[in-house]
Amino acid sequence: MIDRKLIFDPGKNQVIQTESGERYYFSLDERGGDGAVWDARSDDDDVDVTVDHTYPPTEASVRIRVHRGFDGPSTVYFVRKKPGSSEIVRKFTMSFFKRTGNVAVWE
């Protein structure tokens, strides 16, 4: 069974303990009048991230899927940029660790 979780505080750097097959869903606010939108990328093939936008930009829906066989750690990088610009308006990361009996710490 897939464990679906909602990340309650998106927009801040977070450390998450996870297992293979887990999925995470949350929304990011894109209101603000500047037209800036969120984008995300993962540094690991074992973690997929998808960002869907509403039009006009008011909200980004984020889905993260941890593949079977995930052994961590992995980080997803989020950046909010204005269209056609390299200027970063806001950014944060989500670091994923394989869940074990021990607490994982990101240094």
Spell out what each predicted region is:
Residues 1-26, 31, 101-107:
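N-terminal edge beta-strand
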Residues 14-16, 52, 66:
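Outer-membrane beta-barrel proteins
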Residues 24, 34-38, 74:
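Short beta-strand/loop motifs in extracellular/secreted proteins, especially
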Residues 32-54:
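Short, solvent-exposed loop/linker segments at beta-strand-coil boundaries, enriched for Pro/Gly
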Residues 56-63:
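Aromatic sugar-binding surface patches on proteins
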Residues 67-76:
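Glycine-centered tight-turn and secondary-structure capping sites
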Residues 79-83:
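Beta-strand-rich extracellular modules
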Residues 86-106:
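C-terminal edge beta-strand
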